[in-house]
Amino acid sequence: MSLILAVYGKGGIGKSTTTANISAALALKGAKVLQIGCDPKHDSTFPLTGTLQKTVIEALEEVDFHHEELTEEDIILTGFGGVDALEAGGPPAGSGCGGYVVGEAVKLLQELGVYDRYDVILFDVLGDVVCGGFSAPLNFADYAVIIATNDFDSIFAANRLCMAIEQKSTRYKVKLAGIVANRVDYVKGGGTNMLEQFSDKVGTKLLARVPYHELIRKSRFAGKTMFQMEDGPEKEECVKPYNEIADFLLSRNPTSSVPVPIGDRDIFEIVGGWQ
């Protein structure tokens, strides 16, 4: 039975890069992994495949939206480490619903019966707006993971995600595994001071601290995971947190919780206390 993860976070903070590197770390530890990009930008799997692959929506358009005419090969591409990759895609700008597209991708995967062949399935989901469609992966997930940076906007989005997880947990099995601190900069960004305080208040923990490092940015633009970059101390520093997260997720009983969201004023107090 697959371990299903829903990875959320505010747009533009490195969520997809982090997810791809977690997928790579899991695969290198022997897991059979599927990563599903659930963002209209359809670039979630780029570090794994080195290409902007065809989306589910593009594939459906080619067969006039007849699901039964699609095969796995039409929508799944195998990338680094044997990780299978899929991109849901999105509707044309100004029309349709991106969340609906996520739901259609999930429906197609169910019809193809691919779930049971994987050890781990990761949904990489846009987390700025957790509407019904974009929250759909929480219906299937064992755990949610939030990617966040040490700033107000990211923490505000993380709190909204905690609200969605809390609400979904009343009907589904999903729990919050924890928060991954991304782009951690102890010189300019305060490290993880605000994230640590926020995590304590909502009843979760920081799973790992991914450093703010130029090498991670370079790997992203090169269409590679950090594990494919040249060996050296900098690479070791960057891949360490991804391996820590993979080890945690592959443990038999990873700790988790139903988060307790805080009020907006509480977030302002956290941020204001560190200015």
UniProtKB/Swiss-Prot annotation:
Transmembrane spans: none
The protein's enzyme class: oxidoreductase
Catalytic activity: chlorophyllide a + oxidized 2[4Fe-4S]-[ferredoxin] + 2 ADP + 2 phosphate = protochlorophyllide a + reduced 2[4Fe-4S]-[ferredoxin] + 2 ATP + 2 H2O
Alphabetical list of SUPFAM superfamilies matching this protein: P-loop containing nucleoside triphosphate hydrolases
Binding-site list for [4Fe-4S] cluster: 97, 131
Any one GO BP annotation for this protein: photosynthesis, dark reaction
Biological pathway: Porphyrin-containing compound metabolism; bacteriochlorophyll biosynthesis (light-independent)
Names of the cofactor(s): [4Fe-4S] cluster
Residues at which Mg(2+) binds: 16
Catalytic activity, EC: 1.3.7.7
Protein's UniProt keywords contain Metal-binding: yes
Nucleotide-binding among keywords: yes
Residue numbers binding ATP: 12-17, 41, 182-183
GO molecular function per UniProt: 4 iron, 4 sulfur cluster binding; ATP binding; metal ion binding; oxidoreductase activity, acting on iron-sulfur proteins as donors; oxidoreductase activity, acting on the CH-CH group of donors, iron-sulfur protein as acceptor
Cofactor: binding details: Binds 1 [4Fe-4S] cluster per dimer.
InterPro entries: NifH/chlL_CS (IPR030655), NifH/frxC (IPR000392), P-loop_NTPase (IPR027417), Protochlorophyllide_ATP-bd (IPR005971)
Name of one Pfam family that matches: Fer4_NifH
Keyword list, A-Z: 4Fe-4S, ATP-binding, Bacteriochlorophyll biosynthesis, Chlorophyll biosynthesis, Iron, Iron-sulfur, Magnesium, Metal-binding, Nucleotide-binding, Oxidoreductase, Photosynthesis
Family to which this protein belongs: Belongs to the NifH/BchL/ChlL family.
Complex and partners: Homodimer. Protochlorophyllide reductase is composed of three subunits; BchL, BchN and BchB.
Job description of the protein: Component of the dark-operative protochlorophyllide reductase (DPOR) that uses Mg-ATP and reduced ferredoxin to reduce ring D of protochlorophyllide (Pchlide) to form chlorophyllide a (Chlide). This reaction is light-independent. The L component serves as a unique electron donor to the NB-component of the complex, and binds Mg-ATP.
Protein name from the UniProt record: Light-independent protochlorophyllide reductase iron-sulfur ATP-binding protein
Organism field: Chlorobium phaeobacteroides (strain BS1)
